[in-house]
From Swiss-Prot:
Heterodimer of GatD and GatE. It catalyses: L-glutamyl-tRNA(Gln) + L-glutamine + ATP + H2O = L-glutaminyl-tRNA(Gln) + L-glutamate + ADP + phosphate + H(+). The lineage of its organism: Archaea, Methanobacteriati, Methanobacteriota, Methanomada group, Methanococci. It comes from Methanococcus vannielii (strain ATCC 35089 / DSM 1224 / JCM 13029 / OCM 148 / SB). Gene3D superfamilies: 1.10.10.410, GAD-like domain, GatB domain, N-terminal subdomain. Its EC number is 6.3.5.-. Disulfide bonds: none annotated. PANTHER family: GLUTAMYL-TRNA GLN AMIDOTRANSFERASE SUBUNIT B MITOCHONDRIAL AND PROKARYOTIC PET112-RELATED, GLUTAMYL-TRNA(GLN) AMIDOTRANSFERASE SUBUNIT E. The gene is gatE. It holds the Pfam family GAD. Keywords: ATP-binding, Ligase, Nucleotide-binding, Protein biosynthesis. This is Glutamyl-tRNA(Gln) amidotransferase subunit E.
Length: 633
């Protein structure tokens, strides 16, 4: 839907979280390596909220503790340590991580803090073993320029990343601590963004600055965007975990649709004199003989069926508020998160779940349900069902007032779902185990004098210096392999930089699409490959097969890969002999077509010689030998 975003008073702010590609973690010497092999062990914990320095307890922390979830943490003996498991004090802050934070701050025109103090930010969703995240305020009051105008940068913080979620059960969550402690930059903008397109452009520009440092991780999950969205007569909504830049625009559009729809529903509910009753009624006996598989499943597990009455809500619970999501989905999300139930049912949709019309009418009569009223059911264990319905009652009451402020989770389709209330300010307190860091004038000067080349400047240089076309230059500048490209181009001047760039960007992607793990390749492999090419040990046509050889046999040297694959480069004389043999085998075609047989013969030559000789040499040799044969007839 097209909206007048200015008239709606749309305001959007971003929080960008970017992992840094440092040698060690922020507070220990473990590598910043994410693993997917079998962990070496597990520990279990329960986390509980505690008071801040001001004697307050954060409401989001209280909510999480009500879930009574057990947290399981996987670890590795060789790449994680006791710091991640919260059994050893943190070490000093990673100097590499801090320098990168200061560098990015400078590129965004920010003012450094004179002293950097490590703080503890309370987290009780289990994603930190300690129940808090260590974070430090580095800089403030900056700005970036975009094609839509200037966007102010509020702050930049350096913090530790959280654990990686492995599994989420009803009563437990399993994490791996390999990600915990990886240095993470948190960049927060002011709510200066006034359209979905501007939101996407702001995130793209910040991402460009981050990649310019050459010190950030790449790939899915290494950058996460949180988007704060509000409109007039709406509420501030924090959308967590947008991993795809292209999704930001759609997330903003759909959240605007959601808030506009919820405001319209509020007006309709008020017009109906809608009311939410607090009473939770047990209807287990009433529906004890139902044939509904969903309800019977709960009853077989010694569950109960509980119900609430929403006066004036009939026909509105099924109203769409986002593409494919309804007001009932909003209620269901609350019940799932706060009650731990699988879902809920309402009278507008009950026949879909195998509940008969007769049972629906009986239920409505039992609940004193009027024509405009609706009933919501939950079938589960007694305590879960009651917790879920209490959450639904609260959310239904909020729908009569307006839009609740909350934190929502980004979904892959551009929609969002309820996660938790917006956190309060009572979740931060000082870290006493790490000393403060002074940012001296010498440090500031060193950072300013060693700033990286910005992508726009580097693109122009690549076009001039390496003779790349504009598209390839832009692609190479934004590549994780940009430093490797420059090193190889300077080391092997007899190889065209275009070939090196194409190999690093296009060839590797093509091989990855074939299902091969290109992560196995090291810089040493690629260096050896181009060394072999520069020494005429192989042809450029052999590059894809050599790379595949390295992937399948990472410990092999180039000569071994070439030998196994039969790709050792032929001499000119050997190429001539093969081509003459092919011409003689197809002499009848040559006699009939003369030079017109070139295309057919070239295909047969390449079938035998591809990867063993340069295509140009094969083509020239074939032309010459074929001409000799034709003229000699």
């Amino acid at each position: 839907m097209d909206y007048d975003y200015e008239k709606l008073g749309l305001k959007v702010g971003l929080e960008i979280h970017q992992q840094l590609n440092t040698k060690r973690k922020l507070f220990c010497n473990c590598p910043t390596k994410i693993r997917d092999d079998e962990p070496h062990g597990e520990i279990e914990r329960f986390l509980r909220p505690s008071q801040s320095e001001m004697g307050q307890v954060d409401k989001a922390a209280i909510l999480e503790s009500r879930k009574e979830k057990k947290f399981i943490y996987q670890y590795y003996n060789d790449t994680t340590c006791l710091v991640e498991l919260d059994d050893e004090p943190p070490h000093n802050v990673s100097e590499e991580g801090l320098n990168t934070a200061l560098e990015v701050s400078t590129l965004m025109n920010m003012n450094f803090a004179d002293e950097i103090h490590v703080m503890r930010k309370m987290v009780i969703d289990g994603s930190n073993t300690s129940g808090f995240q260590r974070t430090m305020f580095v800089s403030q009051d900056g700005f970036i320029e975009t094609e839509y105008g200037k966007i102010r940068i509020t702050s930049l913080c350096l913090e530790e990343d959280s654990c990686k979620k492995v599994e989420d059960g009803r009563d437990y969550t399993k994490y791996c601590v390999d990600r915990l402690g990886i240095p993470l930059l948190e960049i927060t903008t002011e709510p200066d963004i006034t359209s979905p397109k501007m939101g996407k452009e702001a995130a793209r520009r910040i991402g460009t600055i981050l990649r310019a440092t050459g010190k950030v991780k790449r790939g899915l999950g290494t950058i996460r965007q949180d988007v704060n969205i509000s409109i007039k007569n709406g509420a501030r909504i924090e959308v967590k975990g947008v991993q795809n830049l292209d999704l930001i625009e759609k997330i903003i559009e759909n959240e605007v649709t959601r808030q506009v729809s919820l405001n319209n529903l509020k007006e309709e509910l008020i017009g109906r004199n809608a009311e939410v009753l607090d009473e939770i009624i047990d209807v287990t006996e009433l529906l004890n003989d139902t044939e509904s598989k969903v309800l019977r499943g709960a009853l077989k597990n010694k569950g109960v069926i509980k119900a609430i009455l929403l006066k004036g809500f009939s026909g509105l619970i099924g109203k769409e508020v986002q593409p494919g999501r309804r007001l009932g989905t909003e209620f269901s999300d609350r019940g799932k998160v706060l009650g731990g139930v699988g879902g809920l049912f309402h009278t507008d949709e009950l026949p879909k779940y195998g509940i008969t019309d007769e049972e629906v009418n009986k239920l409505k009569k039992f609940m004193n349900c009027g024509e405009n009223d609706a009933v919501i059911l939950v079938a589960d264990a007694k305590n879960k069902a009651e917790r879920a319905l209490l959450a639904v009652i609260e959310r239904a009451k909020e729908s009569l007032i307006g839009i609740p402020e909350e934190t929502r989770k980004a979904l892959d389709d551009g929609n969002t779902s309820y996660l938790r209330p917006l956190p309060g300010a009572a979740r931060m307190y000082p870290e006493t185990d790490v000393p403060k860091i002074l940012i001296t004038s010498e440090i500031c000067e060193r950072i300013k004098n060693n700033l990286p080349e910005m992508p726009e400047e580097k693109t122009i240089r690549f076009i001039k210096e390496y003779e790349l076309n504009e598209d390839l230059a832009k692609q190479m500048v934004m590549s994780y392999n940009v430093e490797l490209f420059e090193n190889l181009s300077k080391k092997y001047p007899n190889i065209k930089p275009t070939l090196i760039a194409t190999t690093l960007e296009a060839t590797l992607k093509e091989i990855k699409r074939e299902g091969l793990d290109t992560e196995v390749l090291t810089d040493e492999h690629l260096n050896e490959l181009f060394l072999g090419l520069s020494e005429d040990k192989m042809s450029k046509e052999a590059i894809p097969e050599v790379i595949k050889g390295y992937i399948n046999n990472p410990n092999m040297k180039l000569d071994e890969v070439l030998d196994v694959a039969g790709l050792s480069k032929m001499s000119k004389e050997e190429v001539e002999a093969v081509i003459l043999d092919i011409i003689n085998q197809n002499i009848l075609i040559v006699n009939e077509k003369g030079m017109g047989a070139t295309g057919l013969l070239m295909g047969r030559c390449m079938a035998q010689l591809r990867g063993k000789a340069d295509g140009k040499l094969i083509n020239v040799t074939l032309q010459n030998k074929l001409k000799e044969k034709v003229q000699g007839q």
